Amino acid sequence: MNKFITLFVLLASVSVAMSATCLTCVKEGAVCDATANICEEGTVCIKPNSTAANTICFVLPTLNEDCSGPLACADSYYCNTTSKICVEAYYLGVGESCSSENQCSTSLVCTGGKCVNEVYPLCGASNSRVGCKAGEGCAFNGTALVCSPFIANGAACNTSTSGLCHPVSSCSNGVCTAPLTGALNSNCTSNTDCNIANGLYCSSGKCTAVPEALNNCTTTPTVDNCLGYSACMCPSNDDTAKTGSCKDTIEYSDVTSDAYNKYDSCVVSCPAVTIVQKQSCLSKCTNPLAGAANNVCSSATTIAFNAFVVFAIVLSVLLF
């Protein structure tokens, strides 16, 4: 899958248990361990300031609020390193209208009211699609990384040109391949290469059926009994439990080809940016995986994925 999968959140943050245990849900203000807990909706597990002894489930500041404590902002806003205020920054791409330079993505300048890559058609300092126009990818032409139009699904691709496949597609077996097209036992490099709606995910390079949920699971950094898009949740939120039950973190049937086709069309029509914020073109593109997310905690939209899920629903898409 292309580099855009640093992609996603709209609703969630990823947490992977670091010891053999199950995951529990934690309320705002409570001490948390990002390797074993899931903070409730609207909070993240972070030290609220540099002198805090513990990480807690904390509500991050948002636009125009003080971020001097956590040095991070909600809604993908940028914590200005000087003012320590959450601001809009780096959210516009090549060709979009700007009034100040910090609106443009890093490596771009605001010239004549537009965000410009001064070395175009070279991809520029970002070495990514951020230096390219909407409808273009960044690929090696034998000499340098240059911006070129995307190539269609079904067209030939290789290591050098894989960056020209659509951002939500992958270069699989030498062909730009649309997501969700992989049948059982077909080759894959990412979960989204497989037909998720049919309960498939990518395991050891093959589209594989998600097994029946386990009722006696544990999670470690390298081994997770829960496979596919699932999390090992402790029974009755009991933080003394050592085993739990696998809970689906998405509604598999909701992740359809039609939804991905719409997502693909939206992403291709927008320029890439350093940070996707509310004013970014990409903010209107809803990843179907985010739309299909389940709340594994009754009051939480923060989701824990197992160690093998190469997917993060985050709204900061640095290499989209």
UniProtKB/Swiss-Prot annotation:
Glycans are attached at N49, N80, N141, N158, N187, N216. Loss-of-function mutant (antisense inhibition) shows reduced cell adhesiveness and forms smaller aggregates than wild-type, though it does complete development and produce fruiting bodies. Its main location: membrane. It is a lipid-anchor; GPI-anchor. The lineage of its organism: Eukaryota, Amoebozoa, Evosea, Eumycetozoa, Dictyostelia. InterPro entries: Diff-Dev_Assoc_Protein. The keyword S-adenosyl-L-methionine does not apply. A lipid is attached at S298 (GPI-like-anchor amidated serine). This is Cell-cell adhesion glycoprotein 64. Disulfide bonds join C39-C57, C67-C79, C73-C86, C98-C110, C104-C115, C123-C138, C132-C147, C157-C171, C165-C176, C188-C202, C194-C207, C226-C246, C232-C234, C266-C285, C270-C281. The gene is gp64. GO terms for biological process: cell adhesion. Keywords: Cell adhesion, Cell membrane, Developmental protein, Disulfide bond, Glycoprotein, GPI-anchor, Lipoprotein, Membrane, Signal. GO terms for cellular component: plasma membrane; side of membrane. It comes from Heterostelium pallidum (Cellular slime mold). Cell-cell adhesion during development. Contains 18 disulfide bonds. It is found in: Cell membrane. Residues 1-19 form the signal peptide. Residues 299-320 form a propeptide.
